[in-house]
Amino acid sequence: MALFTPPSEDKDGRDRSGGGDKASGVVRTPFHLRPSLGLALWGPLVPASDNRAGLWTLVGLQTLMGAFFVSRFRALRPKLLKRDIADFPSLNRFSKTSGDMHVGPVHVFADFGGTHSFHRRAGESPGFFQSRRFVSLKRALYLSTGVVLLVQSALESARLTLLVYDPWEEQARGVRDKQFYNDVVRYYHEGVDPARFIVKDPASGNTLPVNVPEVKQGVALARAHTNARNIITRWLGPLDCKPLSSSEFLDKLEHYLDTCDFIQDMNNKRLFGNPAEVKARQKALDALIQANKENRRRIRHILDITPPRGLPLSPKAVDQGLRSIILDPDHESTEDLDLHELWSIYNPWVDLALDTSLSIKFLPTVRTPEELLGDSEDTAVEQKNPPVQIKRERG
């Protein structure tokens, strides 16, 4: 006998346990906002930290918005009107002089009377949206919004340009590469569904079996590349990526800067060492440079006051070989040399014959009795030739 227990649902058919997603097998991927220093206004539209093009696009749009609000603030300021005095007959009735007068947008001569004030009634006041207070409020909102947007754009631009090491960018790049590798492995183990994919040989055009490892690897790479080129993945990166918090970002950045300072200090100590030794080496180097300059000056002075060929030859020039070619110092060009005479005196073949002593000797091979007994009896013993010596006599 079997016992059936109905699921714990209410009258509406809803699951009371709250495990509907788990029972249906649907796994919801949590989405985390991408970090930034000045793009918090865009919320989930902020791209991944390694998407430089997307970050610069949002920075440009935010800068344009800030400039628009600042321009609206400037447009709502009180305008000064430029009038000529001749346009006011009550002020220039008996005079022919003229001049410029700057007045505000509200007539300052309303108390003096005039046709422009006939339409106004006693006790009439403008509405709230036309009042100065509302205009001032709008100007304050425009100015504050524009300044905040421009400052945030400047912060994000400084992060993208001034920071040599960005932990958020490094993490986003690493997570993106890891997702691509995991996708390749997952698609490879999933295999290829013949109903969805048809693999053909590019050379012959024949259909290939989908269970071949090479085919599975190629299809897995193609699917991983397609997933990586998805517009959402390219903009936001892996959706399940949880970026570093602000405190972790600052800790990693501080650690990087401290490491750079430590390495720089170690390099400086290795190069310079003790300050006293550095000063001593610097003084010795300066003294050596000064001595070299003095020696060059003295040598140049001696060469200037000495006639040509007045200096003795260098000791290295005197120390020559026995059959070195010695030329007359009076010869200044190759035309002054007698080639036949030089060839007869310094014949290189004669020098080679004098320096060469060649002797060739053929010596018999000496074998021990044990070696002779170990050989087979039918092995013929070759007769050894007498030693021959060839000597090349010097010519």
From Swiss-Prot:
<keyword id="KW-0496">Mitochondrion</keyword>
<feature type="compositionally biased region" description="Basic and acidic residues">
    <location>
        <begin position="8"/>
        <end position="19"/>
    </location>
</feature>
<feature type="region of interest" description="Disordered">
    <location>
        <begin position="1"/>
        <end position="27"/>
    </location>
</feature>
<protein>
    <recommendedName>
        <fullName>Mitochondrial inner membrane i-AAA protease complex subunit MGR1</fullName>
    </recommendedName>
</protein>
<keyword id="KW-0812">Transmembrane</keyword>
<feature type="topological domain" description="Mitochondrial intermembrane">
    <location>
        <begin position="157"/>
        <end position="395"/>
    </location>
</feature>
<feature type="transmembrane region" description="Helical">
    <location>
        <begin position="140"/>
        <end position="156"/>
    </location>
</feature>
<keyword id="KW-0472">Membrane</keyword>
<dbReference type="GO" id="GO:0051787">
    <property type="term" value="F:misfolded protein binding"/>
</dbReference>
<dbReference type="Pfam" id="PF08602">
    <property type="entry name" value="Mgr1"/>
</dbReference>
<comment type="similarity">
    <text>Belongs to the MGR1 family.</text>
</comment>
<feature type="region of interest" description="Disordered">
    <location>
        <begin position="372"/>
        <end position="395"/>
    </location>
</feature>
<feature type="transmembrane region" description="Helical">
    <location>
        <begin position="53"/>
        <end position="70"/>
    </location>
</feature>
<keyword id="KW-1133">Transmembrane helix</keyword>
<comment type="subunit">
    <text>Component of the mitochondrial inner membrane i-AAA protease complex.</text>
</comment>
<dbReference type="InterPro" id="IPR013911">
    <property type="entry name" value="i-AAA_Mgr1"/>
</dbReference>
<keyword id="KW-0999">Mitochondrion inner membrane</keyword>
<feature type="topological domain" description="Mitochondrial intermembrane">
    <location>
        <begin position="1"/>
        <end position="52"/>
    </location>
</feature>
<feature type="topological domain" description="Mitochondrial matrix">
    <location>
        <begin position="71"/>
        <end position="139"/>
    </location>
</feature>
<dbReference type="GO" id="GO:0031942">
    <property type="term" value="C:i-AAA complex"/>
</dbReference>
<comment type="function">
    <text>Component of the mitochondrial inner membrane i-AAA protease complex required for mitochondrial inner membrane protein turnover.</text>
</comment>
<dbReference type="GO" id="GO:0006515">
    <property type="term" value="P:protein quality control for misfolded or incompletely synthesized proteins"/>
</dbReference>
